[in-house]
Amino acid sequence: NSKDIDPLIKAAKKNKVIIKEAFMVRHHPQWQWIKKFIKSGNIGKITNISSVFSYNNKDPKNIRNIQKYGGGAIYDIGCYPTVISRYLLDKEPKKLVASNFKDKNFKTDVLSSVLMDFGGIYSSFTVATQSNKSQQVFILGTKKSIVIENPFNAEPKKSTNIVIYNGNSIYRKDNTIKTFPPIDQYEVQVTAFSDHLLKKTKVD
């Protein structure tokens, strides 16, 4: 929780160093493009963001399944749909409701669903650790909608696609595909932070 971060912040201030949370997704060009696209007004007003992120891991020795080490779906991957919603909307949620199902042996959540209220804009997500491997984000606007095929774990050696549905048909016949070339979002993240330290550039 936020209290766990306080000692790190104090240490950084004391030693006059810079720290940054390592959310690599914010540095992938697809998300930066989407944020600009939303700000342009092309999608209209965002009404909902829906995300799914899941994998299947039942190894009792894996840190993701050990409660005392912060295991479970919410702690492991729930942060990604949360941070993307905050990044795109430039807002903090006013309230949220959540429900989860826990493994009877691990005592960690293996299936969790969350609904966040950003004040007239909803963001909902489901994360799971004992389900089919899957990831997707759907952004619903009053004019158009967007589907991000590989929103969180983008393969560094393969291109990524986002699909923009123009809203002229409920059957999604009228769409545009935006393709981004292969890129390692972790490398981009490290480069951005290094440039911030060495060249005083702005880091988002």
Label the predicted regions.
Residues 1-26, 41:
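Beta-strand-loop-alpha-helix segment that lines the small-molecule cofactor/substrate pocket
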Residues 9, 13, 35-38, 86, ...:
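A structural alpha-helix within SAM-dependent methyltransferase catalytic domains
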Residues 15-18, 45, 119-121:
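Short, well-ordered coil/turn segments that N-cap beta-strands
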Residues 25-104:
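Predominantly a Rossmann-like dinucleotide-binding segment in NAD(P)-dependent oxidoreductases
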Residues 69-75, 175-184:
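A short glycine-threonine-serine/GTX helix/turn-capping micro-motif
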Residues 82-156, 187-202:
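Contiguous beta-strand/loop segments that form the cofactor/metal-binding neighborhood of enzyme cores
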Residues 137, 155-171:
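Short polybasic amphipathic segments
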Residues 174-179, 196-204:
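Glycine- and charged-residue-rich phosphate/anionic-cofactor binding loop of Rossmann-like
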